Amino acid sequence: MASQLRLHLAATPPLLPHRRPHLARPLCPTLNPIRAPLPPLSRVLSHARPARAVGGGIEPKEGVVAEGDESGGGPVLVGEDSAAFELKDQSVASWAYFAGILGAVLVALNVLWIDPSTGVGTKFLDAVASVSDSHEVVMLLLTIIFAVVHSGMASLRESGEKIVGERVYRVLFAGISLPLAVTTIVYFINHRYDGTQLWQVQGITGIHELLWFSSFISFFFLYPSTFNLLEVAAVDKPKLHMWETGIMRITRHPQMVGQVIWCLAHTLWIGNSVAVAASVGLISHHLFGAWNGDRRLLSRYGEAFEVLKKRTSVMPFAAIIDGRQKLPKDYHKEFFRLPYVAITMLTLGAYFAHPLMQASSYQLPW
């Protein structure tokens, strides 16, 4: 699992009343961290050849204007083109393999963790719940456990991959993180209305639509974690990517921003102490993840990341407003891509499937 924990499970979370019983050749290849200082940026920009991302690599493309050219334009990129997806570069065999792996993982997850008669998920949750009778405390503990495991394994990724390889480490990472994420999500769904009510806004006209729209938008920030699904499933060799286009121009840490938007919207809607506890845990985890992510990218990409960092921002739109980020004239085209279309359709579909998702969650004694 490459993404951070999200209580949406690839869906816009419910805002319903409770019913419960090309781009430039990168200055640093993805797989080869920079070990020597880069030449001055002005020199790089004057000699760099514009390029476009194709699949997992980069190939030259004419006609893209680099900074310093007579016709003007945005700076040559040091990172990768996010959400680049071309059908001609896809392998049917790879996606069939991905589907098979996904099916096997879901079956194993159900048998070994979710099913109370065969899995250990219920015993794990009982052990955590034995610490306190407070749903708020248990909710916070679950997010902390997930955060420690998820961020800890991400931090150890470089060392771990040297020992067991990229694919094996990704399988271990997902195999440990996914059950913990599912447990936290199900517990939140089952107990989100069990806390102390702090405010009530569900009857206010227009609040549902406002918060639903906020949750929907949050997924365009959260999505970069799955730009490379074949790598998530270890079909392709996993890499530590340094994205630079699309949503990354708005904020360098879209997952953190998306999670904050999601948490604020749902905490306002639910309005109780359990929602507050979940949001505190998740936002804290993602704030640490933003710092840790910068640290890992700096370690892997060196000066190239420093260049990217100077022209991006953590706070949404800050780099654009103060002029450090120069949006290309056709910036909107960076969103008119199949991955963004797919996430839009899946998010809408999952939202309308929330009654089924809730019913499945309520069947578990979690």
Curated annotation (Swiss-Prot):
Membrane topology: Multi-pass membrane protein
Species this protein is from: Zea mays
Tissues in which the UniProt entry reports expression: Expressed in leaves and roots, and at lower levels in embryos and endosperm.
PANTHER family assigned: 15-CIS-ZETA-CAROTENE ISOMERASE, CHLOROPLASTIC
The protein's name: 15-cis-zeta-carotene isomerase, chloroplastic
Subcellular location: Plastid, Chloroplast membrane
Domain of life: Eukaryota
Main location: plastid
